Design a protein with these regions (language model features):
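Rossmann-like AdoMet
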Residues: 2-100, 104-147
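Short loop/turn elements that flank and shape the SAM/SAH-binding pocket of Class I
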Residues: 150-153
């Protein structure tokens, strides 16, 4: 995936990019995002995830580890294909479904299935949702919940 040429601002951030603090957030959520974006930009992609491409272009983040890990990238794409098919099939049969995507990270499946569900809830840890909310402004039928699925409350 090509990186845009940009300049640094006074804060040491790339102009036009958003730097995210990964403190307390699993970096794998950005690596999986990058894998989907990189696949989408191939000449003959196995999946299409325009939201991932849009977010990666806005991020000031070093994706060199994700670029080197072909096995991880291929696994992400295989998992995306399988889960998109399973979710799509279910939603085709249950158009009034309410979906809860637990440990969503930067998953964008809700956008790839827009119009095929009644409501969609993306749930993850507060630290993760803080990053997600900077790039995905979800409202209407898509909601974000910052909580642990392990909490009893």
């Amino acid at each position: 995936m090509e990186q845009e040429k940009t300049t640094m601002n006074q804060n040491g951030e790339l102009e036009g990019k958003t730097r995210v603090s990964m403190e307390g957030v699993p970096e794998t959520m950005l690596q999986t995002l990058y894998a989907r974006a990189a696949e989408t930009e191939k000449e003959k992609p196995a999946i299409r995830d325009e939201k991932a491409v849009e977010i990666v272009k806005r991020l000031d983040y070093d994706f060199s580890l994700a670029k080197k890990d072909a096995a991880m990238g291929n696994g992400v794409i295989a998992r995306t294909i399988v889960l998109d098919k399973l979710v799509g099939n279910y939603l085709n049969e249950h158009s009034n479904a309410v979906v809860v995507n637990i440990a969503c990270g930067m998953d964008t499946r809700c956008y790839r299935n827009e119009g095929h569900y009644k409501r969609w809830y993306n749930l993850d840890l507060p630290e993760t949702m803080e990053v997600r909310q900077r790039f995905l402004k979800e409202d209407g039928v898509i909601s974000q919940i910052a909580a642990s699925a392990m909490d009893a409350d």
